[in-house]
Amino acid sequence: RVLSLELNKDRDVERIHESGINTLDIEPVEGRYMLSGESDGVIVLYDLENLTRKPSYTCKALFSVGKSHPDVHKFSVETVQWYPRDTGMFTSSSFDKTLKIWDTNTLQPADIFYFEGTVYSHHMSPVATQHCLIAVGTKSPKVQLCDLKSGSSSHILQGHRQEVLAVSWSPRHEYVLATGSADGRVKLWDVRRASGCLSTLDQHNGEKSKASSEAANTAHNGRVNGLCYTSDGLHLLTIGTDDRMRLWNSSTGENTLVNYGKVCNESWKGLKFAISCGCNPEFAFVPYGSTIAVYTIFTGELITVLRGHYSTVNCCVFQPHFQELYSGSKDCNILAWIPAPREPVLDDISEKSLPQQHLNPAYEDAWSSSDDEG
């Protein structure tokens, strides 16, 4: 189904935003509600479910934290995330140096964490049962952990040398955190340990640094501004401004050396790419200029390019229940990429026509022509 993703003229997302969209998140409980955050501080919540039961429908905005809201972010919202266990709470972080914990029902902040520098990224563990820590990457090289239970943000992970652009908890081990920095390094941490850092990933797998310490290891020859675990937590995918994407074995820290070719990445801040869940094989959806490049994760093959936005794509999010993709762009639009409906299989297909039914969909266009989109 992922191989047949396309813009669908019967599906639209209500246009609310007046500036570029930086971040999207779909709640994992029902897969129904989506948050978006934009570059002027506004947050919008959408209902993705088709309540009209008609083939053609628009995903409606249920509410927004707009410019007139007393607690709206003053500057660009860089990350939004639902509380993993239910839809009663969500989080947002911003260039206004805050992380806000929102009560969905009242649309009021239940808590606000303040930082000394710009906040690039934050993440809550999708599997944690023993802690309520939010990892936060800021302009400081220190990774900060905010505790929802105590309200404290005193726990700090030290080791990076420049700003931390991306953070992600492992979906396999609740105390393991991955961070990516402008220093070219990706670090894995066990937040229970006093020393913290488990390893610093080495793109050369030790070949060039056997005589030197682990401190010399780099994951990319540029800023690391995106990272994401596979859904099983066994691998970590990272992206850097060296125009490279790398796949790592998350338990050994080994670079798997999968070659994705040149992955253009000029973003000076975090890049929000997505990984599929429940597909075989699994795919990575990577913002690539005004398009989205779709790669098979374990072979590195570029399967297709999704075209539809008019400006730079900043983020995308995968909806696993229906294997749909949503993307946000500087053009102020959120686009829905829907698997093309399968052709009905007729009972009286002749044997001669069977080979045509088995064309590899990877070689078909995965977007609509402009006529179809009209």
Model-found features: residue ranges?
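Per-blade loop-tip surfaces of WD-repeat and WD-like beta-propellers in eukaryotic adaptors/scaffolds
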Residues: V2-K9, L45-K74, R85-T87, T98-L133, ...
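Long, well-ordered mid-to-C-terminal structural blocks that present hydrophobic/aromatic surfaces
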Residues: R223-S250
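Loop/turn segments within WD40 beta-propeller blades
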Residues: D25-G31, Q81-T87, H123-H131, S150, ...
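Internal, well-ordered interaction modules that form the hydrophobic cores of assembly/scaffold domains
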Residues: S93, L165, W169, G180-A182, ...
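Intrinsically disordered terminal extensions that flank WD40 beta-propeller domains
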Residues: R1-L45, E49-T52, L346-G374
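Terminal intrinsically disordered, low-complexity extensions flanking WD-repeat/beta-propeller proteins
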Residues: R1-V2, G206-K208, N255-K272, C277-E282, ...
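Conserved strand-to-loop turn within each blade of WD40 beta-propeller repeats
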Residues: G37-D40, S92-D96, V136-S140, T179-D183, ...
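Signature of short aromatic-glycine-proline-rich micro-motifs recurring in repeat-based ectodomains
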Residues: I21, V77, G222-G226, G270-A274
